[in-house]
Amino acid sequence: MAAIINQRVDQGESSMGGAKPTLLHKIAGHVARINDVILLSKDEGVWTASDDRSVRLYLKRDNDQFWPSIHHFMPVAPTCLFYSEETYKLLVGLINGNVYEFNVADDFNSMTESRKWTCHAGPISGLGFALSSELIFSCSRDKSIVWHCSENSNKVGSYLLENSCTAMVIDLPFVFVGDHGGHVTVLRIIDNQPNLVSKLSAHTNSITSLTWDGNKKVLYSGSSDHLIIMWDIGGGKGEAYELNGHNGKVTTLCAAPAAKRLFSADEHGKLMCWDMDVRRVETPEWKTSDCCQKCNQPFFWNLQAMWQRKVVGLRQHHCRTCGSAVCGSCCDNWTTYPPMGYETKVRICNDCAGRMKENPGNFDLTPLAIPHEIRTGITAMHLQETLGLLVTSGQNRVVMIWDVRSVCSAPSGSGGH
């Protein structure tokens, strides 16, 4: 029987206390999957892009309900949106690789097409606008990143990846692009020309979402491998910290830099709020061995040792806290370990379990994240941190607006990584 370390932490409050997101509004009416949502900060409104080819702007009316103020149909399904509240310009990326720009009326009752670009040969997977340099960025499943001048519409640069682009964030001069192979490419744009800085590789499946904390210079990547990785770009040490709290594909991420929080959501409807103002520990690399590193029993592929000892080979496991390659008998303990990002129970070896039991004061198991079940898979999410509002779209085609002020303002744990 597997041993459970410190069962009491299941009922304990997190480092942020007992705060939870509060549902404020539901917006129904879509007949197809919602691919993107944007929450306005200056007005009470939500942009949506749907597989039914529609781009809609919902505004809050006097009766406290949201109704579509703009309902525009695109030639094909829109895949992503970017909206500038300063310029009232809306960018719409389509499944056929085109990007449209619209001027939105200041009364939010209409939008007028101003131009379009045939940028890519595949679906648009990311859009961005750098106001300071007047550049519009787009990336696509066709493996390319392209940037145009917003003043004259001319293409000024491009870059080709080895895999399909799946997500992008911009903080010039840097551009971060996630791809289908699980890599994050870091580019520096100098005089409109791309320079490869590095390729971040740790995920085992495609990147689904990226978000950037400009205050701490930290990049977060979410993936189909259920994992979130925090890349400390500004630290200069190449440190990366794993966040394990999802049991399905992570679909979208939103950083709250001022509150030092990270919001993540997955395909099963689990919404997580992570405390990023705590000291975290890097996960160890998994060690390789042909025999259990605790009892020396051979693993099932070690045929020579199995034949010599006349024993049946064992399945290999790894201790999540020390990385040792061990057999099932030597790794029969389960525990959370939030400082290493493990918010759900993971397997650890008997030695690590013994140390935790003997010295519980050295292993703080207080949860460092708040889970919240939405009960429908999340397809898109957007945060307005200054308002303390979060918007999500679900697989049930319902848009939800959440009050997350209590989560963002809750006291955190000890600072630092």
Swiss-Prot record:
Zn(2+) 1 binds at residues 292, 295, 327, 330. PANTHER family: LD41958P. WD repeats lie at residues 29-68, 119-157, 202-241, 245-284, 373-412. Signal peptide: none annotated. This is WD repeat and FYVE domain-containing protein 2. Keywords: Endocytosis, Metal-binding, Repeat, WD repeat, Zinc, Zinc-finger. GO terms for molecular function: zinc ion binding. InterPro entries: WD40/YVTN_repeat-like_dom_sf, WD40_repeat_CS, WD40_repeat_dom_sf, WD40_rpt, WDFY1/WDFY2, Znf_FYVE, Znf_FYVE-rel, Znf_FYVE_PHD. A zinc finger (FYVE-type) spans 286-357. It comes from the Eukaryota. GO terms for cellular component: early endosome. The keyword Secreted does not apply. It holds the Pfam family WD40. Plays a role in coelomocyte endocytosis. PROSITE patterns: WD_REPEATS_1 (PS00678), WD_REPEATS_2 (PS50082), WD_REPEATS_REGION (PS50294), ZF_FYVE (PS50178). GO terms for biological process: endocytosis. Zn(2+) 2 binds at residues 319, 322, 349, 352. It comes from Caenorhabditis briggsae.
